[in-house]
């Protein structure tokens, strides 16, 4: 056996969403920021993304995290996110799993009762607080990048539904926030495939009438995720949501950046105050508890700093991926 490439990964999950944290095997990435390093991988090493994330080594719903040397002196590590289709500057569920991997493998020194980790992402610096009880991780808490409501009541022409009002928000990624009740739908395991299909039409319709641009990070200028929201709470007070990302992939977790975005939506619509807890749930039973820590501004745009907590983050395995030179499928593939 002649292996031309080795990649070391730690697999984890955040409320069921599979996260693959790449800890070794990526060539040194060039750039003066993690955003530039992500672009270097996109331009010059994209075959590694497809190799790691696609079949036969990966699968469609897998989320990847690439650890790098940070460029900011404040950060412990740099990180950006990948999936089978593309790159993402931020992933909340992924960041929670990254923190779990860093503390459990000794890549960051464990400090009890709380370990603080600063990560440089293409969206900016985020801080993660790992809380310990009885020498075990009890919860992982993300102080995310500022979140804001980009556009209220945007009207789109949605095929089969006519005129539909949605909001556009940002919490690490840009989202179309769609109220499922206004579409005559609910969020259940049985409707997820319908929501996946509908997300493509929603994104196409929204991108026809709006061009997004982050107020201080011009490279973040694309709208490619939909967060379907049930705005009537469950009996336990939580709110169901379903994020659709990538190639119409359904997030298994409640979605960390989506939770941050929805928190900002509710805050700027006057439905919740700072330090009030908002619980976003997935149909698979996962829950993220979020609150707004404080107000801020981004290039004059009002925003809040979200704090997202989860107690269901676990390591599932350690893997040494190899690429044999004569493997015809070494670059990966997507079947269906």
Task: Identify the role of each PLM range.
Residues 1-167, 176-336:
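A glycine-rich beta-to-alpha transition motif near the start of alpha/beta enzyme domains, typified by
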């Amino acid at each position: 056996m002649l292996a031309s490439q080795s990649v070391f990964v730690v697999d984890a999950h955040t409320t069921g969403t599979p996260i693959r944290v790449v800890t070794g095997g990526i060539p040194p990435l060039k750039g003066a920021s993690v955003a530039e390093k992500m672009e270097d991988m996109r331009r010059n090493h994209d075959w590694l993304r497809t190799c790691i994330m696609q079949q036969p080594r990966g699968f469609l719903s897998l989320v990847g995290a690439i650890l790098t040397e940070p460029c900011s002196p404040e950060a412990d590590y740099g990180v950006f996110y990948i999936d089978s289709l593309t790159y993402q500057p931020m992933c909340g569920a992924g960041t929670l799993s990254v923190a779990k991997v860093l503390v459990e493998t000794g890549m960051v020194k464990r400090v009890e009762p709380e370990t603080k980790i600063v990560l440089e992402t293409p969206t900016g610096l985020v801080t993660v607080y790992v809380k310990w009880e009885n020498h075990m991780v009890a919860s992982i808490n993300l102080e995310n990048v500022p979140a804001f409501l980009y556009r209220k009541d945007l009207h789109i022409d949605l095929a089969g539904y006519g005129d539909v009002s949605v909001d556009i928000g940002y919490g690490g990624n840009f989202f179309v926030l769609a109220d499922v009740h206004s579409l005559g739908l609910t969020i259940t395991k049985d409707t997820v495939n319908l929501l996946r299909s509908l997300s493509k039409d929603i994104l196409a319709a929204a991108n026809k009438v709006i061009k997004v641009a982050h107020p201080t990070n011009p490279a973040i200028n694309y709208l490619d995720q939909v967060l379907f929201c049930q705005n009537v709470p469950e009996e336990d007070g939580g709110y169901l949501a379903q994020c659709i990302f990538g190639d119409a992939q359904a997030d298994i977790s409640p979605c960390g950046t989506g939770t941050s975005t929805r928190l900002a939506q509710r805050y700027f619509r006057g439905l919740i105050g700072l330090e009030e807890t908002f619980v976003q749930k997935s149909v698979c039973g996962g829950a993220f508890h979020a609150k707004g820590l404080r107000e801020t501004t981004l290039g004059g745009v009002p925003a809040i700093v979200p704090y997202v907590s989860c107690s269901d983050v676990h390591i599932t395995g350690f893997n040494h991926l190899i690429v044999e030179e004569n493997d015809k499928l070494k670059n990966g593939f997507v079947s269906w």
